[in-house]
């Protein structure tokens, strides 16, 4: 029933389309790192929740620990939020990779920019998580100009960071975010 409601909101209220070869594979992939870009506005979070619900798959996301205060913490945990301390160097990549190894099913959604501001290069944490956990990366674009999301086929990192990042960044190059001037361009 929830899937029907999410899809109704996406299709009829905000007129958003979901395209790609692999939205069925999101559920068949028990483990993956899902990167969503461009992340330019706080509204992206709610659009992501709608897309995730419309596709009927579960995923978690990281949020700074400072946000997990009552009563907001209830909502964040309910929507899949995992609190992280970003202020200290606590080997976060290995900690997250160990979550994949301990669970039969775990999907983590991340914004590869690491901020809502414009960046010229993506941060690399998601990449190293995927390599260490031995899971594919699925790319999901939020194109506000065309009101659509495109989902990539699963991409298995080769370990050649330059090659892999060229491939990943090309997928998102020129996709217009909610705040156009913060969109990702190579």
Which residues are covered by each model-predicted region?
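Soluble catalytic domains of membrane acyltransferases
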Residues: 16-174
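N-terminal membrane-anchoring alpha-helices
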Residues: 1-19, 183
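Charged phosphate-binding loop/patch that engages nucleotide di/tri-phosphates or the phosphate backbone
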Residues: 170-186
